[in-house]
């Protein structure tokens, strides 16, 4: 039986190992991520940046010209098997594919795993953690103020008192703020449509990438 030379086998093996490492290892140093493109008219008021904890109502589609630079590292942190949470997670995955984002996922296995899941996501040191699922709001409220260097994007819910590292995207029907806290609108699972969730992750990511953090992006129109 013919066997390839040992040297050839070693070259192929080294190439395979190198390829796997370059795509999977987040410990590798690389340039800081940045926004590619610019926000359109109407995302913010002309000449003014939104104040911390304020609510921003962008013009529909004004975020569409912004995408992350190649290699942007994102963790999708999800919890809950309800349709809104699943629709949000699907939208994040589709955005990541379209934008060439390096996406990893952390899914909480139950109530007892909510806080550990947040910790696991942070230990990966991504550029951004995107949260999908109302069950994660209370754990994020506990953890995020102590980790200001980590950016969070909450989609379809919000924190009652966010720090500058927590940005949220909300709309009428999706403004859960934590157990026992009032909401700015009546919760409506039907408002979590594919189109709205797709717009929400894109608008929220554009806000974070352009430095508009610690705010709520209100997305009744998209």
Residue map of PLM features:
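Sec-dependent bacterial lipoprotein signal peptides
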Residues: 1-18
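Bacterial signal peptide processing site
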Residues: 20-24
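Extracytoplasmic low-complexity, Pro/Thr/Ser/Ala/Gly-rich segments
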Residues: 25-112
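Solvent-exposed loop/turn segments at secondary-structure junctions
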Residues: 80-83, 134-138, 157-161, 222
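Short, well-structured alpha-helical segments in soluble
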Residues: 113-125
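Periplasmic-binding protein-like
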Residues: 126-134, 151-155, 216-217
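Ser/Thr/Gly-rich flexible loops in soluble cytosolic domains mediating phosphotransfer, phosphorylation
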Residues: 150-197
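An alpha-beta-alpha
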Residues: 181-222
């Amino acid at each position: 039986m013919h066997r390839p030379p040992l040297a050839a086998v070693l070259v192929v093996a080294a190439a395979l190992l190198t390829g796997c490492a370059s795509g999977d290892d987040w410990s590798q140093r690389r340039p800081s991520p940045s926004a590619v493109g610019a926000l359109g008219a109407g995302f913010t008021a002309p000449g003014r940046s939104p104040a911390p904890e304020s609510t921003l109502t962008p013009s529909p589609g004004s975020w569409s010209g912004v995408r992350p630079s190649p290699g942007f590292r994102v963790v999708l942190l999800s919890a809950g098997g309800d349709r809104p949470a699943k629709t949000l997670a699907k939208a994040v995955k589709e955005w990541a594919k379209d934008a060439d984002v390096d996406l990893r996922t952390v899914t909480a296995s139950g109530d007892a795993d909510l806080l550990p899941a947040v910790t696991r996501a942070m230990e990966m040191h991504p550029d951004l953690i995107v949260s999908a699922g109302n069950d994660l709001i209370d754990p994020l409220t506990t953890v995020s103020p102590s980790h200001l260097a980590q950016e969070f994007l909450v989609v379809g819910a919000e924190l009652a008192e966010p720090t500058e590292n927590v940005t949220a995207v909300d709309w009428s029907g999706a403004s859960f703020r934590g157990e026992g806290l009032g909401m700015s609108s009546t919760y409506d699972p039907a408002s979590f449509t594919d189109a709205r969730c797709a717009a929400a992750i894109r608008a929220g990511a554009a806000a974070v990438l352009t430095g508009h953090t610690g705010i709520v992006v209100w997305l009744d129109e998209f």
